[in-house]
């Protein structure tokens, strides 16, 4: 009913297939729809053929999938669009905090909308948070312990609350530094200082920020 990105076609197709239905898509996955520009406020996206009882069985589940994923893709599209308009050329990523049982679908919807899916689950990358650091005594020790049990291809991300912690994590060999719950201005200062501090010191790392970001204040962090 509102403008947005169509998403979830492959999953809806599986529902229709299992219900012995034929579907013809009139709009492609990832297309931006603008029903607000039509005379009746609607856009026909597909035609489904089959027995009435089978259509009724598939109707609600397929619509729920399309609505859920299209909503996520649309929000992702709006977010990355605003970031680009602010001049940001880096990556915008979703989180692992997805709806139970729907992670694959929701991560897919993020990608359709144009943002990165980040890690899929806990096995995708080591992330050291405050509890891990507290239990080992220091960021350096936590990273050392992690390196002992992971392969060379697995990255380590460390959540930090200050520049001091970030510098320790970089020195210890972290691949990604998450600046957590920084203010917009504080983030810019910390990021610039870290880049200057480690310039030409043979340390390669990504900076990531998380916490407190919304569409309304996104420009303050970029």
Task: Locate predicted features.
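Acidic/glycine-rich phosphate/pyrophosphate-binding loops and surrounding catalytic core
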Residues: 1-172, 176, 188-193, 220
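Glycine-rich beta-strand-to-loop/alpha-helix junction loops that act as flexible
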Residues: 179-180, 207-213
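Short acidic, glycine/proline-enriched helix-loop-strand junctions
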Residues: 196-206
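C-terminal non-catalytic interaction appendages of large macromolecular assemblies
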Residues: 211-222
């Amino acid at each position: 009913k509102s403008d947005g990105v169509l998403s979830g076609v492959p999953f809806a197709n599986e529902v229709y297939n299992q219900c012995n239905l034929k579907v013809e898509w009139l709009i492609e996955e990832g297309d931006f729809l603008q029903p607000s520009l039509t005379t009746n406020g609607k856009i026909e996206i597909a035609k489904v053929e089959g027995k009435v009882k089978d259509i009724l069985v598939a109707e609600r589940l397929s619509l729920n999938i399309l609505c859920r994923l299209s909503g996520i893709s649309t929000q992702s599209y709006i977010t990355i669009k605003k970031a680009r308009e602010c001049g940001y050329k880096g990556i915008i990523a979703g989180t692992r905090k997805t709806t139970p049982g729907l992670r694959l679908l929701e991560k897919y919807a993020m990608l359709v909308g144009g943002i990165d899916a980040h890690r899929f689950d806990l096995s995708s990358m080591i992330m050291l948070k405050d509890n891990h650091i507290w239990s080992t005594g220091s960021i350096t020790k936590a990273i050392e312990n992690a390196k002992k049990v992971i392969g060379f291809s697995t990255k380590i991300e460390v959540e930090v609350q200050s520049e001091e912690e970030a510098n320790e994590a970089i020195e210890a060999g972290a691949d990604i530094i998450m600046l957590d719950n920084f203010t917009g201005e504080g983030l810019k200062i910390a990021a610039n200082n870290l880049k200057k501090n480690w310039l030409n010191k043979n340390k390669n790392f990504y900076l990531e920020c998380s916490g407190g970001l919304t569409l309304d204040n996104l420009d303050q962090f970029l």
